[in-house]
Amino acid sequence: MAVYEVDGRKPQVDSTAWIADSAEVMGNVTLGPDASVWFGCVLRGDTESMTIGEGSNVQDLSVLHADHGQPLRIGKHVTVGHKVMLHGCSIGDESLIGIGAVVLNGARIGKHCLVGAGSLVTEGKQFPDGSMIMGTPAKVVRQLTP
């Protein structure tokens, strides 16, 4: 695992969090309890803060970047699928971001949402809690049932 300090900001990793050997985590990144970052991931908090909530997992080859003025927030018990790109966005608790999805600056995914594989959530788009979100550009397909 490669953990880098950037401009005096070093990642804060809970003692119960796990980072794969081939993952890279840099700058103002906070990993909560039982969070995990898998093989080949890059988490860049070099320009803004990033928070990965308790019990959340970032799967293989995903890239997460907090942009200038656009912090990246992942809630509790979130699954970020393989090869996902998250950029300066917010993901609500207990949501799932499908394989290969892209979520851009200022986008907000509510709690208990599902973003379909390969979907593109465009800049600034907001989705309410409990949404099934799919497509390019992404839109609400339906509300999920509890």
Model-flagged regions — what are they?
Residues 1-13, 18, 40, 46-76, ...:
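Glycine-rich hexapeptide-repeat left-handed beta-helix
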Residues 23:
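Compact, Lys/Arg-rich rRNA/RNP-binding cores from ribosome-related proteins
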Residues 26, 38-40:
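Short secondary-structure capping/turn segments at boundaries of alpha-helices and beta-strands
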Residues 26-32:
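N-terminal glycine-rich anion-binding loops that anchor highly charged ligand groups
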Residues 34-35, 52:
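Short Gly/aromatic-enriched secondary-structure transition segments
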